[in-house]
Amino acid sequence: MHEPQSNEALEKLWTLAQNPPASLNKVRFTGMEPSLPSIYKTGILAQSTIAAAALASAEIWQSRTGLSQTVTVDIDAASASFRSENYLRVNGNNRFHTNKLKPENNIHGFYKCGDDGWIQLHANYPQHRKDILQTLRCDGLRKSVSNKLLTMSALEAENKLTNIGLPAGKMRTVEEWSEHPQGHAVARMPLFTITKIGDAAPIKLSQNPKRPLEGIKTLDLTKVIAGPLIGRTLAEHGADVIWVN
């Protein structure tokens, strides 16, 4: 059994990147939703995007070696990779969890506001946390932030924080989002675009690589989540990546 929607999502990603549709026959999906506790179909999202990257790698491998292969992606394994920060170990240690704040001091997350609306605060970075606390005039306790937001509407809190460049957002229904100017703008945009930013001679790659992207060198200047994940994915398939954060 597999999720038909994963095939549909992959097809959209693959064709949007102007890749040959015939290659999609090399992909196999296994597993069904739900894979993670969510109102969103995170398993389908994980499965289709990972398959797109893996298929691209397989196509490059075939162009360099002449060897074709089938790409198989299990929905549970794909979903686990979307929570990889919980499983990654560096020299045997999970360094991402060594300096976590105590729950009562962690103000990142979702809050109910005075109008029964909700807001999400992004406060994982120390400077964001400091500025949010200063703007709301709260101490470092989550309870203090919660009490303050109960005196404000979700929209008021959003405006107060975003007007000075802080990452926070009112949680909206599908209908509310579709009426929002940003919702209108996003609806008119493709999921992604590929823009050529300069001309250069094609890199000559060897025909006997050990990995699909062997010989590719990448300088990664991104910072949060999606950006570094791109660099990590390239490295997984054999590219040399330097991440400057």
Where are these regions (language model features)?
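Acyl-CoA thioester-binding alpha/beta core of soluble enzymes
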Residues: M1-N245
